[in-house]
A protein has these predicted regions:
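Structured, active/binding-site neighborhoods that engage oxygen-rich ligands
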Residues: 1-245
């Protein structure tokens, strides 16, 4: 049980640390990042794009923490309650908020957007999912994405990610086995061809371009799968995104 708790803690801390490190370089061109951080972005510091303090969450992690607090309180998921919580967060005037999320929370969902905002906040639901059947976790993850990112690609990416997190924490699944399970789940769910392509390509290469369509859920999903299979430690998994702003 203690090891399971540690895996859950590592998942949430990984989200928060990665997001806080990214705040130092978000939207900067790769050349500027390399000049400023020749050895990579490794230390939590103040400053950056949003002049944050060391370790301060950005919008994605603020929403993830909001979700985490609700799940700790209730031990279940309720889409209406999270819609209200997300509106509370938006009305708190966060220093940043994605366009897709802001529009959706103000009643103007964009069904064409394939942005990664829903995927970026889903880790707490995967953690809670260790206590529930994977089908339940999947359904909750889809409901949560539907609040802000109703495009089918976003819904399906959320479902696969939440399943993977719950499975990895609950079963201590090794990377190779987890990838095979993700591939099987994707086929069983008949996910969009873009996701299937990302899964196939992730076996042999990382995303070709992190910049041109920055914020696209397919790039985030593809990179996650590549790092799952090939990164030998945590910083190596974060480096591609951090080096590309």
């Amino acid at each position: 049980m203690q090891e399971k708790i540690q895996r859950a803690q590592g998942c949430l801390l990984g989200q928060l640390v990665g997001d806080a490190l990214d705040s130092l370089v978000e939207f900067l061109p790769p050349q500027m990042i390399h000049k400023k951080y020749p050895n990579g972005v490794r230390k939590l510091e103040d400053g950056g794009t949003w002049d944050t303090i060391p370790g301060q969450p950005k919008d994605d992690s603020e929403m993830a923490l909001l979700l985490a607090r609700y799940l700790v309180k209730t031990s279940t998921y309720n889409a209406k309650a999270m819609q209200n919580a997300n509106l509370f967060w938006l009305n708190s005037q966060p220093f940043d908020c994605g366009v897709t999320i802001a529009s959706a929370l103000l009643g103007r969902k964009n069904p064409n957007s394939q942005a990664n905002g829903a995927l970026m906040r889903i880790s707490p639901l995967g953690i809670l999912g260790t206590n529930y059947p994977l089908a339940t976790v999947e359904n909750w993850a889809i409901q949560d994405a539907q609040l802000t990112h109703p495009n089918p690609v976003c819904l399906q990416a959320n479902a696969l990610m939440a399943r993977a997190i719950a499975e990895a924490i609950n079963q201590n699944t090794d990377a190779k086995t987890l990838f095979i399970k993700i591939k099987h789940w994707a086929q069983a769910l008949a996910v969009d061809d873009l996701l299937l392509q990302a899964i196939e390509e992730s076996e042999i290469a990382p995303p070709k371009d992190y910049i041109t369509q920055q914020g696209w859920v397919i790039i985030a999903f593809h990179n996650m799968l590549w790092q799952l299979q090939h990164a030998w430690e945590q910083f190596m998994a974060l480096r591609p995104f951090l080096n590309n702003g």
